[in-house]
UniProtKB/Swiss-Prot annotation:
PANTHER family listed in its UniProt record: FI21813P1-RELATED (PTHR19143:SF327), FIBRINOGEN/TENASCIN/ANGIOPOEITIN (PTHR19143)
NCBIfam families membership: GGGWT_bact
InterPro entries assigned: Fibrinogen-like_C (IPR036056), Fibrinogen_a/b/g_C_1 (IPR014716), Fibrinogen_a/b/g_C_dom (IPR002181), Fibrinogen_C-term_domain (IPR050373), Fibrinogen_CS (IPR020837)
Organism: Apostichopus parvimensis (Warty sea cucumber)
Protein name per Swiss-Prot or TrEMBL: Fibrinogen-like protein A
Length: 282
């Protein structure tokens, strides 16, 4: 009798895991939710159900049962790969937030924190917007410097940058270490070694603080974040740049825009850019 009960319990767990990993749909909401969700102490199970039916056994044990990043979600179903899409996570020390998880590229588990795809979202924004995040997870967004800081402070993280040029050719840049500091450090950038096909246009900005048009932290005589010659947009400027993926969107006019200096082809007319991070445990 005991053996039968154990087998039935295992079967229920496997069915729940397969249901999440194969058939669940990404969350329906289109706008990023950066504000903290109120926790229901009386119904923690109900909160868990809101995470797209997540019922797989978890390797994480911290309260309140939300994964810390997309890598945690990937690891929650042994032998099965959850779909790419929107999920709730809660980084250590941070708020409950909704993110887009890339579960396909380079073995999956990537938490996407920036995307440029169609110019529908204005990226020429103030410090406070970049601090908390803005945009639409279905199109273009910045996840927020506070959120990126909390994510990259949880352990050893890597960065992957995806880029398309005007010919439609795809390139990537990967850094084996990625972290940004807190608001007191003005989100100082820390990078490791480069690999990839896009060229290393970010190492120049290593150890630089984040700048916006209303908070100039570069080492140049002008504010690089507000100057039209550099595409405008917030970034870890130095004096001034070899890259800026938050510049004004590519519009065929030839004006400075999203920029990656060593990208083959049109390095300052980039129609697609995406930045994502992942725990290096993979």
């Amino acid at each position: 009798m005991f053996s039968f009960i154990m087998k039935a319990a295992i079967l229920l767990i496997l069915v729940g895991c397969i249901s999440f990993c194969i058939s669940s749909e990404p969350l329906n909401e289109s706008e990023i939710t950066f504000e903290r969700e109120e926790r229901s102490l009386a119904d923690p199970a109900g909160r868990q159900k809101r995470q797209s039916g997540l019922s797989c056994p978890k390797r994480i044990s911290h309260s309140p049962e939300y994964p810390r990043d997309c890598y945690d979600i990937l690891q929650s179903c042994s032998g099965q790969s959850p779909p790419s899409g929107q999920y709730y996570i809660q980084p250590d020390g941070g708020n409950l937030i909704k993110v887009y998880c890339d579960m396909e590229t380079d073995e999956g588990g990537w938490t996407v924190f920036q995307r440029r795809i169609d110019g529908t979202i204005n990226f020429y924004r103030s410090w406070s917007y970049y601090q908390t995040g803005f945009g639409n997870l279905n199109t273009e967004f910045w996840l927020g410097n506070d959120n990126i800081h909390y994510l990259t402070s949880q352990g050893d993280y890597e960065l992957r940058v995806e880029l398309n040029n005007t010919l439609g050719n795809h390139y990537y840049a990967k850094y084996n270490k990625f972290r940004i500091g807190d608001s007191f450090s003005e989100y100082l950038l820390v990078l490791g070694a480069y690999s990839g096909t896009a060229g290393d246009s970010l190492a120049y900005h290593n150890t630089m603080r984040f700048s916006t048009y209303d908070n100039d932290n570069d080492v140049y005589s002008i504010n690089c974040a507000s100057h039209s010659s550099y595409g405008r947009g917030a970034w870890w400027y130095k004096s001034c740049l070899l890259s800026n993926l938050n510049g004004q969107y590519y519009d065929y006019s030839g004006a400075p825009s999203i920029y990656w200096s060593y990208l083959p082809g049109d390095n300052d007319q980039i129609p697609f850019a995406e930045m994502k991070l992942r725990n290096r445990s993979i």
